[in-house]
Amino acid sequence: MDFTKKILVVFAFTIMLGISSVHCRPSFKPIPLFGEKLTQCFDTRPCLQGMLKCIEFCSSMGTADGQCNNENLCCCTHE
């Protein structure tokens, strides 16, 4: 009787460990390759005021450069 309780406890812990490892898996974020720059686009508000406002916005975010794209989104480039 005691042996089956131990097996049941080990089985329960194995299931709990399996479930926790599935739920706690870190999200995959691609790392830019050497020389490749990461670009992140934001809303249109800075670009409505001109390219300089987009550059100022991106500088305040701590990025290297900012440009308005064809959709008038302010895109910041990370180095």
From Swiss-Prot:
Transmembrane segments: none
Subcellular compartments: Secreted
Disulfide bonds: C41-C76, C47-C68, C54-C74, C58-C75
Domain of life (superkingdom): Eukaryota
CC per GO annotation: extracellular region
GO biological process: defense response to fungus; killing of cells of another organism
Signal sequence annotation: 1-24
Family stated for the protein in its record: Belongs to the DEFL family.
Protein name: Defensin-like protein 109
